Amino acid sequence: MKKTLAALIVGAFAASAANAAVVYNNEGTNVELGGRLSIITEQSNSTVDDQEQQHGALRNAGSRFHIKATHNFGDGFYAQGYLETRLVSDYPGSSSDHFGGITTKYAYVTLGNKAFGEVKLGRAKTIADGITSAEDKEYGVLNNKKYILTNGNTVGYTYKGIDGLDGLVLGANYLLAQSRVPGGPGLFPRKQGEVYPQQISNGVQVGAKYDANNIIAGIAFGRTNYKTAGADFDFSDAFGLGRKEQVEGVLSTLGYRFSDLGLLVSLDSGYAKTKYHTTTTDSDDGRQTITNPAYDEKRSFVSPGFQYELMEDTNVYGNFKYERTSVNQGKNTREQAVLFGVDHKLHKQVLTYIEGAYARTKTNDKGKTEKTGKEKSVGVGLRVYF
């Protein structure tokens, strides 16, 4: 019998968990180990005002390892600990194959009840993480974290509907600071322990998603405050730390699943407003003070997409995005992007795919020539789960 699209989607997102090895199961305690190794070979090029750069690579594409321990107390109560590491190369001196080091992606504890929901504390995903419906393996054209943060140091509550409310998920998160000024010599020796300038100070978000009866609908709202780099950190704006103060954003999705056809169509969208605070700098000769006024940046996007079961164990997916960014001082950016991919399961623990993306950006600023940028990427990837 032909698989339903719902089963395929659930399988795709939960593959690592479904294939995890149970290493201990006794008296209500369950411990699982799992993860995946992911490799991609790709060709990418970018063009800015007719200046082209091109490169090919064979690299890591999100390899990870996790351990999860669950303790059931009875009467539906449980506690859980989760740790997930990633292989990354986001720091200087790392390898070009992106296997430069190991970092902690998620680390949290959970206390919950099947009927009343769960409370999660630590570095974890937020309710905004699963709001949009677009599928991608590597070159996702949606950048949700510019609208609402999708993970961080958080205290969160999640409720999953039961007894007639299957498919409903409600959530709320409070985000705490995660980056602080270290001790010892540095740029801010007298600010040890304070939130680092232009890093998250705190934030809050709420959201809801419904996925049942062939209908997908979701919305999330978030407000994130950033530590301002005021005069106590950078009196003359000599370090160029940035001026971001607050981001308010909304993400939403609406989709319908044609089960008989194995087709899901969806429409994702988002809106965000970023506030930048006033700063003062000294002129080059030091004789006068220059005030840089506060300003707002607004961005929005719409993205129709689809996922289609071409044949058993083979899926086709894609989406288009139009995004616009405007600043009340006159700078405007428009981006059009498209993504298309095909994936195929060679085995329940082996997935291969080919995916490509193309994006074109136009930037206009007062008194300046329009700038055009293009980016193209195509890759063939392989994931082996364990």
Curated annotation (Swiss-Prot):
Which residues, by range, are in coiled-coil regions? none
Highest taxon of the lineage: Bacteria
The protein's name: Outer membrane protein P2
Q: Where is the signal peptide?
A: 1-20
Give the location in the cell: Cell outer membrane
Provenance organism: Haemophilus influenzae
> Does the keyword Cell wall biogenesis/degradation feature in the UniProt annotation?
no
Q: Which gene encodes it?
A: ompP2
- Membrane topology listed for this record: Multi-pass membrane protein
